From Swiss-Prot:
Name used for this protein in its record: tRNA pseudouridine synthase A
Protein's job: Formation of pseudouridine at positions 38, 39 and 40 in the anticodon stem and loop of transfer RNAs.
Organism, scientific name: Streptomyces avermitilis (strain ATCC 31267 / DSM 46492 / JCM 5070 / NBRC 14893 / NCIMB 12804 / NRRL 8165 / MA-4680)
Catalytic activity: uridine(38/39/40) in tRNA = pseudouridine(38/39/40) in tRNA
Keywords from the named record: Isomerase, tRNA processing
GO biological process: tRNA pseudouridine synthesis
Length: 285
């Protein structure tokens, strides 16, 4: 994937939100499954009268089926003439064409070197769970997990602090051949709101598959007393998947925001993000 925009094209940044309940994830799939990418690309093709031509989106975070996004970012390269013709009315036309569970909030010409995926320096997710004896507020049922054991948020935060930093998160990721599982977890913290809903904030430079939901699964085991606060850190250190770590359900997870560097740093960030990371050797640094 090149960061160079082809001659005659304009790179456009999209800021968008969606309720993931009825989607089979972000990425287009076979067999006609409904996806966020598919809906937006279809709408874009229709409102720009592009016939059979599909302009493919690149996204900051490829969310799984059932996962929501409040602050997702994508980009698309459009022919300059098409962008000039439709720019002023494109946002409103998309609003009229897109289904109600996905919205595009802004369309802007991206700065040189911008790549929605590789330019990002952090992604921030929130996972919401309640241990309310009566269950989840019906109005929040598609966005909050119900855990039927009382949760000790202080114990969960104690466990979370031991996971922050640069580590190999292989124990919390679904393995992909040739892909690194080294990530820098910048924040992992939990707060109980006045309504009893516990919000876990999870921020990292990037995430591997199932990482956020696996981390939350481990912390829930600590919170309900089935494991001690040191257990998630021990699992991390072993470096292999532990069958006791559950991948929690997707509907409690929302991509809240994606961060990018200043425009002049985009090219360097793109190059850095493509490098396969390794941890320092033992005794080094």
């Amino acid at each position: 994937m090149s960061d160079e925009v082809q001659p005659g094209f304009v790179r456009v940044r999209l800021d968008l939100s969606y309720d993931g309940t009825e989607f089979s994830g972000w990425a287009k799939q076979a067999a006609g499954r409904r996806t966020v990418q598919g809906e937006i690309e279809d709408a874009l093709r229709t409102v720009t009268r592009s016939g059979e031509t599909t302009y493919e989106l690149t996204v900051a975070g490829r969310t799984d089926a059932g996962v929501h996004a409040r602050g997702q970012v994508a980009h698309v390269d459009l022919p300059g003439e098409l962008w000039a013709e439709h720019q002023e009315k494109l946002l409103k036309r998309l609003a009229g064409r897109l289904p109600k569970d996905v919205r595009v909030w802004s369309l802007t010409e991206a700065p040189s070197g911008f790549n929605a995926r590789f330019s990002a320096i952090w992604r921030r997710y929130a996972y919401r769970v309640t241990d309310n004896t009566g269950g989840v507020d019906p109005l929040l049922r598609s966005h909050v997990l119900w855990h039927d054991w009382p949760l000790d948020v202080d114990a969960m935060n104690e466990a979370a602090r031991r996971l922050v930093g640069e580590h190999d998160f292989a124990a919390y990721c679904k393995k992909r051949e040739g892909a690194t599982t080294i990530r820098t977890l910048q924040e992992l913290s939990l707060v109980r709101g006045d309504d009893g809903v516990i919000t876990a904030t999870v921020c990292a430079d990037a995430f591997c598959h199932n990482m956020v939901r696996s981390l939350i699964g481990a912390l829930l085991f600590v919170g309900d007393g089935h494991r001690g606060p040191d257990w998630p850190g021990k699992v991390l250190a072993v470096g292999v998947r532990d069958s006791a770590v559950h991948v929690v359900r997707p509907h409690g997870l929302t991509l809240e925001e994606v961060g990018y560097p200043a425009d002049e740093l985009l090219a360097a960030r793109n190059k850095e993000a493509r490098n396969k990371r390794t941890l320092p050797a033992a005794g080094c640094c």
